[in-house]
Structures are given as structure tokens and as C-alpha cells.
Swiss-Prot record:
PANTHER family per the UniProt record, alphabetical: RIBOSOME MATURATION FACTOR RIMM (PTHR33692:SF1)
SUBUNIT field: Binds ribosomal protein uS19.
The species this protein was found in: Thiobacillus denitrificans (strain ATCC 25259 / T1)
GO terms of biological process kind: ribosomal small subunit biogenesis; rRNA processing
Protein name (record): Ribosome maturation factor RimM
Amino acid sequence: MAPSCPTRSRVWSSRTSPPPDLAESEAWVVMGRVSAPFGVKGWVKVQPFSEDPGTLMDFESWRVGRGEQQAQYAVEAVQDHGKSLVAKLVGIDDRDAAFALRGQEVSVAKSALPPPEENEFYWSDLIGLTVMNREGVELGKVDSLMESGAHDLLVVKGRREHLIPFVAAFVGKVDLAGGTVEVDWGEDY
């Protein structure tokens, strides 16, 4: 029985075994992280990284782990839980197994994601892009993104670290094919 949680939930009752592994060449997108066990029957609490916490509810399987240490799990059930989710993964049947997943990244197959709208990007597509300012000076590469209270920030690492708000006032053209981001940002900011 699922924990008592308000609002939406999804159950895949036909899921009794893990899904077959997708090809290793499959690209995966980190969509959240397991923050804690939830209850004593193997449920986990998940902190989504997407704007809509319910986005992860649309996927029947998740890859959980970090780096080379990842495993794919079928999602037996998932529910909204405030700004987070609680989920039951096939094969995670008690609190100890759920606790072992604490802090692990939750990823989904990139091929299962809808294409982004115009002028919207998946964070994973921005990682590694070269950041140039309007004067043609290379500031570094996008190392990661982070949320601030007001907006997302590009974390750019080069000779020094730059935290650049990912908003139209500072970010000009994003050229995924060319591997660059143009910004209105001084080298010494």
C-alpha cells in the first residue's frame, strides 16, 4: 500500500521485475536525487531538479546512482509529496535498501524526453559548452547549473569561476551545434 500523500499519483501495477537495460550508449539526463527513505516498505523521497516536480512521474523506469555505479529500476508507483516525490522502485523493498540510495542521482533516458521549446534547453545540453563574452573573450566552459532564488545560474569554470544568470539580459545566443554560449558578461565580473 502506498504512503498517504496528497494530489497526484501513478502506479504501474504490471511492473514486477526491473526493465531490461537500455543500450549503454543511451544518453541519460539527471532529473533529481534520492533525498531519503520514506517509510519502512522501501519507498524513497526524491528531490526533482525540474521546474515541475511531477515531471519524473511520467517515466516508468529510472536509472539511480552516480558515475559508473548506476542501476536501472522500474518505477512501481510514484506520488507528489509537496515539492518532492515519493516513489516505490521494484526491488527496493525495505527501509535499509531505500536508505542505501540516499544521495544518488535519478536519471531518465534522454530519448524519452520531449524536445525543448524554442529558447529552452535541458541543463544537460548546456554542460561543457564554451562560454564567450560579446568581446570574443573565452570565459570558460559550463561546468554545471544551479538554482538561485530568482533564476538559474550558469557555473562557468575557466581561469576563474563565473556565476552567470541564465536570463536574456545576460545570455545571448546558445549554439548547441557549435558548442558555444554568448554572454554579456565581463571577464573580471
